[in-house]
């Protein structure tokens, strides 16, 4: 994996583990890529301790050159170090239009009209993240501004992410709101037939079941059996193989905790590596499900180590604006996912631990109990979405 995709996986799993520990027994769903883009745009203008905290949490500090000092006065975006230009390339690869798959990532900065932003910051964020600044009046038109931002997000996510900022969540004293929206709708390479979908039990925990709409098909898919912790790993590609859903299904409910405990960038890469997965005929049972989640990220990011950014006194965003006291007052992440027969609508140990030999002719993959899933960009190995289905 390249340095950027490694950082993407590490950050994704850090966020997952933090959300998982704070939402025990709940469904989890978020876009790690969306968060990474948004925080990288902040990093572009961060300096000092704020910059160091962000680089560490995003796992950039050991993978690429950090931002060079003097960026705010420099005439070229190339002065800002390699990470953002790498992002620019990745962004264009992932954001390519495709008639069979809708994937749109949209970034925008909302700044108070009284705030001066460095022109260099604005031009570089537009070049690499296609993020434009829109000036608004937080102080005098707070409610109107909130509606403006929500309407933009709703439009960019095809109406799936509505009311991102609820009433009273934007303060009149706000000076900057950074918004990142991501929307995905993909068709399966091998669609499930609606006539094959049946009502079936889904085991939530020992002795507790719910009835779900269980989709079914027999097809040729990449599958791996992991011995420790015991699980099946299935890859369901979307049309054109640009993206795929990776499902980590524990053998029995008890193994889920072990998978979560051992999950890191190394084990994820090992478990989901194409060299460890064998193409074979598989009977797939997968529940139809929809997830809609909303997370306040302030406390989550603070617990990961980004503390100064949310502190008006300590935050150093001098690469973004010469104005003192600029900080991020609120970070909210809302996601939507719909998995159906057609496809998905949404807004990765030693070689011995993976068994790829002596498999039965046809394998069964029965997702009738909680599992983890990831939507991944095949070419770059970038994780776009990450989740846990605890209860459909």
UniProtKB/Swiss-Prot annotation:
Disulfide cross-links: none
What does altering residue 148 to M do?
Answer: In allele SERPINB11a and allele SERPINB11c
* InterPro entries xrefs: Serpin_CS (IPR023795), Serpin_dom (IPR023796), Serpin_fam (IPR000215), Serpin_sf (IPR036186), Serpin_sf_1 (IPR042178), Serpin_sf_2 (IPR042185)
- Where are the stretches annotated RCL? 341-365
- Give the tissue specificity: Detected in a restricted number of tissues, including lung, placenta, prostate, and tonsil.
Keyword annotations of the record:
Cytoplasm, Protease inhibitor, Serine protease inhibitor
Q: What is the effect of changing residue 303 to P?
A: In allele SERPINB11a, allele SERPINB11b, allele SERPINB11c and allele SERPINB11d
Cited Pfam families: Serpin
Query: What domain of life?
Result: Eukaryota
From the Swiss-Prot or TrEMBL record, state where the protein is found: Cytoplasm
Report a single Gene Ontology molecular function.
Answer: serine-type endopeptidase inhibitor activity
Swapping residue 293 to I leads to an effect described as: In allele SERPINB11a, allele SERPINB11b, allele SERPINB11c and allele SERPINB11d
Q: What is the effect of changing residue 188 to R?
A: In allele SERPINB11a, allele SERPINB11b and allele SERPINB11c
Transmembrane in keyword set: no
Q: Which PROSITE patterns match?
A: SERPIN
Which residue positions hold the site described Reactive bond? 357-358
One Gene Ontology CC term in the entry:
extracellular space
Matching entries from CDD domains are given as: serpinB11_epipin (cd19570)
Function in brief: Has no serine protease inhibitory activity, probably due to variants in the scaffold impairing conformational change.
Give the family this protein belongs to, as stated in its UniProt record.
Answer: Belongs to the serpin family. Ov-serpin subfamily.
Q: Identify this protein by name.
A: Serpin B11
* Organism classification: Eukaryota, Metazoa, Chordata, Craniata, Vertebrata
């Amino acid at each position: 994996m390249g340095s950027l995709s490694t950082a993407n996986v590490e950050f994704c799993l850090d966020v997952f583990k933090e959300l998982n520990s704070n939402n025990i027994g709940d469904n989890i769903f978020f876009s790690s890529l969306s968060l990474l883009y948004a925080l990288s745009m902040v990093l572009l203008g961060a300096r000092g301790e704020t910059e160091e905290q962000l680089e560490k949490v995003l796992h950039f500090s050991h993978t690429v050159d950090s931002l060079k000092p003097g960026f705010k006065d420099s005439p070229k975006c190339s002065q800002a170090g390699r990470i953002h230009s790498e992002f620019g390339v990745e962004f264009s690869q992932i954001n390519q239009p495709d008639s069979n798959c809708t994937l749109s990532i949209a970034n925008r900065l909302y700044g108070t009209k009284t705030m001066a932003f460095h022109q260099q910051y604005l031009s570089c964020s537009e070049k690499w993240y296609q993020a434009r600044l829109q000036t608004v009046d937080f102080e005098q038109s707070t409610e109107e501004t909130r509606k403006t931002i929500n309407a933009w997000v709703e439009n960019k996510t095809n109406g799936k992410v509505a009311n991102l900022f609820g009433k009273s969540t934007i303060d009149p004293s706000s000076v900057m709101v950074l918004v990142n929206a991501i929307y995905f709708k993909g068709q399966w390479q091998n669609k499930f037939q609606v006539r094959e979908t049946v009502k079936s039990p889904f085991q939530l925990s020992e002795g507790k079941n719910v009835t779900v709409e269980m989709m079914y098909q027999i097809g040729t898919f990449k599958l791996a059996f992991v011995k420790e912790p015991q699980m099946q790993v299935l890859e369901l590609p979307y049309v054109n193989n640009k993206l795929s859903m990776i499902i980590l299904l524990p053998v029995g409910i008890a193994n889920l905790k072990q998978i979560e405990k051992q999950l890191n960038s190394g084990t994820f890469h090992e478990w989901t590596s194409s060299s460890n997965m064998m193409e074979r005929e598989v009977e797939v049972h997968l529940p139809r499900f929809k997830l809609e989640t909303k997370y306040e990220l302030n406390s989550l990011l603070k617990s990961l180590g980004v503390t100064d950014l949310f502190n008006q006194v300590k935050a150093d965003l001098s690469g973004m604006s010469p104005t003192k006291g600029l900080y991020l007052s609120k970070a909210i992440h809302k996601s939507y996912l719909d998995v159906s027969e057609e496809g998905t609508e949404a807004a990765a140990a030693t070689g011995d631990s993976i068994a790829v030999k002596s498999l039965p002719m046809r394998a069964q993959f029965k997702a009738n109990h909680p599992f983890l899933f990831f939507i991944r960009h095949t070419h770059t190995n970038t994780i776009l979405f990450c989740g846990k289905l605890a209860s459909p």
